[in-house]
Amino acid sequence: MVSTKTQIAGFEFDNCLMNAAGVACMTIEELEEVKNSAAGTFVTKTATLDFRQGNPEPRYQDVPLGSINSMGLPNNGLDYYLDYLLDLQEKESNRTFFLSLVGMSPEETHTILKKVQESDFRGLTELNLSCPNVPGKPQIAYDFETTDRILAEVFAYFTKPLGIKLPPYFDIVHFDQAAAIFNKYPLKFVNCVNSSGNGLYIEDESVVIRPKNGFGGIGGEYIKPTALANVHAFYQRLNPQIQIIGTGGVLTGRDAFEHILCGASMVQVGTTLHKEGVSAFDRITNELKAIMVEKGYESLEDFRGKLRYID
């Protein structure tokens, strides 16, 4: 009997699939829908300290091979998600969930993380260092000096399981430099990747989203090769105790299989979940299991990270 069970930081999950932060996770109702689906767990919308409206609409557009968005971190504020998770972990103590968060400044990031540290939250925390869609705010993880400083400051007080969501990197030297920084800290996971920032999609003679004159993060099939490269590059470079969540271009079980083959311990679904709804988790899981049966694999460990090279 094949199994898609997995674990992150010692927490076990019945399935390796989950939503990506930003999709099907704004409200408790959406999170409940993911929780009750075939997904192994969920991650909340990336929370800031206070409620954010986000960027003006239209700010999301499905396009033939994926999506473009410039949402601008709309969310209901940290307390909304943290209170829900604190209640949920008492009701469903056998399951573990992810809380995504980021501050609009380094000071706010520390305020948020200290609040989580002081709470009774027992799940996994994901610090988003990679949002490309807040005007005037750079993607932190492209600035290695700032990333190093923030992680040093965070781990001076934060002792709960923490991972970071990363933007896509495109240069081998950047993989080396980023991994050298991440290996200095007790990170539990890195999430590769957020949307590929600042693409343009045009219909007729116009952009399709309003913020930033149409520039937005690209998701879906467009980014799978980049996502796989990031997953595998960090799998090769990171300490074994830093696991990898693969995100980007997961439409089918084959896509999920490739993320795991490259080294991912969990796989997030974003654009496809937005287009198809939570039934996508069932379909992708069944497709993944069919591939495993065909290849004679019984568990994810049988093929995780075992990408073959050409001599």
From Swiss-Prot:
GO MF annotation terms: dihydroorotate dehydrogenase (fumarate) activity; dihydroorotate dehydrogenase activity
A Pfam family it matches: DHO_dh
Q: Which GO terms describe its biological process?
A: 'de novo' pyrimidine nucleobase biosynthetic process; 'de novo' UMP biosynthetic process
Where in or outside the cell it occurs: the entry states:
Cytoplasm
Q: Which residues form the active site?
A: C131
**Predominant place of localization:** cytoplasm
Which amino acids does the record list as binding FMN? K45, T46, N128, K165, V193, G220, G248, G249, G270, T271
Pathway per its UniProt entry is: Pyrimidine metabolism; UMP biosynthesis via de novo pathway
**Per the record, what is one GO cellular component?**
cytoplasm
- Give the E.C. number(s): 1.3.98.1
The entry marks the following residues as binding substrate, namely K45, N69, S70, M71, G72, L73, N128, N194, S195
Q: To which protein family does this belong?
A: Belongs to the dihydroorotate dehydrogenase family. Type 1 subfamily.
Question: What exactly does this protein do?
Answer: Catalyzes the conversion of dihydroorotate to orotate with fumarate as the electron acceptor.
The subunit field of the Swiss-Prot or TrEMBL record says: Homodimer.
Write down the HAMAP family for this protein, in alphabetical order. DHO_dh_type1 (MF_00224)
* UniProt protein name: Probable dihydroorotate dehydrogenase A (fumarate)
Q: Which organism is it from?
A: Streptococcus pneumoniae (strain ATCC BAA-255 / R6)
Q: What is the lineage of its organism?
A: Bacteria, Bacillati, Bacillota, Bacilli, Lactobacillales
